[in-house]
């Protein structure tokens, strides 16, 4: 089981004027409940809170959902995105290339989230986006782990090809690339399990 989480009330925050230990504890419990609702931690009464294993069932279901939603997004984007919006996506890809060379997985992950989030928002699908994000934490964990054990260039290539297809208004190709992109999880999961077995219990 992943490590138990402990609250350190001697942290620098507790030394800030006007922030009491009681306030810190209350904030911690709120955060703990939110993490538990996202199934990122497991609360065991009288024992403590433990980081949860990766829930592959949630990951698979979210992948299936995103596969459908983002293929439709790609189709709609072909008839909606402006040159300025396309340029913004291309700029994201250019930053990806820079951070791949630097090996900065945190920046790469942030840019990946921004790329997909931008497509939802550019197409006016904020409800879809909020739904996906509400289920995202376990999927995000596997994404980060995949960056640590798999070459990220294929993901970047998918992004570039997707934007090019949208720019060319090729709806069929855009949908195909989007679905292929979401299938990367299935390609990566065996490698993720092999390199990080302690994150799984199924």
Identify the role of each PLM range:
Residues 1-79, 190-202:
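Short linear motifs at protein or domain termini
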Residues 62, 79-144, 155-164, 173-184:
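Conserved amphipathic alpha-helical segments that form helical-bundle/coiled-coil interaction surfaces
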Residues 138, 143, 168-169, 197-202:
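Charge-rich, acidic-biased intrinsically disordered regions
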Residues 151-153:
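Active-site loop of classical SDR/Rossmann-like NAD(P)-dependent oxidoreductases
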Residues 172-202:
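C-terminal effector-binding regulatory domain of bacterial HTH transcription factors
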């Amino acid at each position: 089981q992943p490590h138990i989480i402990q609250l350190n009330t001697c942290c620098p925050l507790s030394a800030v004027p006007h922030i009491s230990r009681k306030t810190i504890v209350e904030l911690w419990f709120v955060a703990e409940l939110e993490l538990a609702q996202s199934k990122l931690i497991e609360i065991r009464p009288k024992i403590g809170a433990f980081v949860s294993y990766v829930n592959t069932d949630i990951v698979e279901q979210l992948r299936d959902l995103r596969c459908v939603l983002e293929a439709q997004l790609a189709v709609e984007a072909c008839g909606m995105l402006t040159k300025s919006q396309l340029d913004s996506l291309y700029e994201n890809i250019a930053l990806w290339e820079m951070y791949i060379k630097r090996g900065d997985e945190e920046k790469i992950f942030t840019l990946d989230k921004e790329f997909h989030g931008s497509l939802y928002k550019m197409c006016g699908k904020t409800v879809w986006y909020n739904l996906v994000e509400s289920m995202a934490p376990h999927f995000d964990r596997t994404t980060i782990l995949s960056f640590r054990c798999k070459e990220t260039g294929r993901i970047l290539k998918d992004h570039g090809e997707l934007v090019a297809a949208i720019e060319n208004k090729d709806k069929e190709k855009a949908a195909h690339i989007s679905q292929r992109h979401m299938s990367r999880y299935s390609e990566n999961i065996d490698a993720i399990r092999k390199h990080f077995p302690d994150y799984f219990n199924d």
